[in-house]
Amino acid sequence: MTDDDRIKLEPGWKNALRAEFDQPYMHQLREFLRQEYAAGKEIYPPGPMIFNALNSTPLEQVKVVILGQDPYHGPGQAHGLCFSVQPGVPTPPSLVNIYKELHRDLNIPIASHGYLQSWAEQGVLLLNTTMTVERANAASHAKKGWEFFTDRIIQVVSEQCPNVVFLLWGAHAQSKQKLIDGTKHLVLKSVHPSPLSAYRGFLGCGHFSRTNGFLEQRGLAPINWALPPL
């Protein structure tokens, strides 16, 4: 996170977001992160993985957007895709509930791992609205500037991509609905898949079959939600 030319970003995203890297909030965010690293703090995900969501799902390929809040803050978990964990890491509770709903909705076997890279490569943008976090300190990088950047990402998708399904789970994700043109896209809302709330409507929401139905109606390939074994 130094200057625009040194940031590894998929070309479509880099072009669409170029102006953001000169905004005052981005300079402040860079300085905040520089100080965190200089203080010896452990920041997740590792630097090369911060923009994994954008690099794994090129702008022109976005079909679905799933919004998370901030990265997992345990060692070895976060790799830049919301809800996803690196191979070899136990599946987190919210993702377990996502798998349960996938099984109920589409009879997809529950995966033995939590690595969602294959979704990202099919056009599912797995975006945390805050893209970094300090180890063992949830929401430690909230309100430091990331939200301006990720709000712009949501707007860019709404403006430039046709027929996208936005899955907004929980109040935080639903607060972003104002950034989305509901006349062009499908917005599906539910409570968060966290064990604290999933039983209040996430389990039973049918979002995955509804997503694929929407895509197929528009002549687009559905998402294969079944994860390959590692």
Swiss-Prot record:
Gene3D superfamilies: Uracil-DNA glycosylase-like domain. This is Uracil-DNA glycosylase. GO terms for molecular function: uracil DNA N-glycosylase activity. It is an enzyme of class 3 (hydrolase). One of its GO terms (biological process) is base-excision repair, AP site formation via deaminated base removal. It is found in: Cytoplasm. It catalyses: Hydrolyzes single-stranded DNA or mismatched double-stranded DNA and polynucleotides, releasing free uracil. It comes from Pseudomonas putida (strain W619). One of its GO terms (cellular component) is cytoplasm. Its main location: cytoplasm. Excises uracil residues from the DNA which can arise as a result of misincorporation of dUMP residues by DNA polymerase or due to deamination of cytosine. Coiled coil: none annotated. Belongs to the uracil-DNA glycosylase (UDG) superfamily. UNG family. It comes from the Bacteria. Keywords: Cytoplasm, DNA damage, DNA repair, Hydrolase. The gene is ung. InterPro entries: UDG_fam1, Ura-DNA_Glyclase_AS, Uracil-DNA_glycosylase-like, Uracil-DNA_glycosylase-like_sf. Its EC number is 3.2.2.27. The active site is at 70 (proton acceptor).
